[in-house]
Structure formats: C-alpha cells, structure tokens
C-alpha cells in the first residue's frame, strides 16, 4: 500500500496534468506561429527521375 501511495504522488507531478485543457491549445498555437508552413521551403535534390526536369 505504501508503494501505491508513492506512485500516485509521482503521477501528480507529471507534465500530463499541465498539458490538459487550454494550456495544450496554447502550446500547439505557439508551435504553429514559430513554424507555420515548414514544407513550403522544401526543394528537390535533383532532376525529376521521369522527365529529367528540375
């Protein structure tokens, strides 16, 4: 029983409780603001295999 109490105490300190609710939304919004469209800057490494075009 003592072991279960210590496990429960450590679970309350986890970051999962901090990320629930509005905090999770603001975190995802911050990530989007810092990196809105990362895939726009993707360039091809070489010519197209099928057509030979760049």
UniProtKB/Swiss-Prot annotation:
Name of this chain's protein: Putative uncharacterized protein YLR154W-B
Note: Completely overlaps the 25S rRNA gene.
Annotated organism of origin: Saccharomyces cerevisiae (strain ATCC 204508 / S288c) (Baker's yeast)
């Amino acid at each position: 029983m003592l072991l279960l109490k210590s496990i429960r105490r450590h679970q309350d300190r986890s970051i999962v409780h901090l990320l629930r609710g509005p905090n999770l939304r603001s975190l995802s919004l911050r990530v989007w603001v810092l990196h809105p469209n990362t895939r726009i800057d993707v360039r091809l490494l070489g010519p197209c295999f099928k057509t030979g075009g760049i």
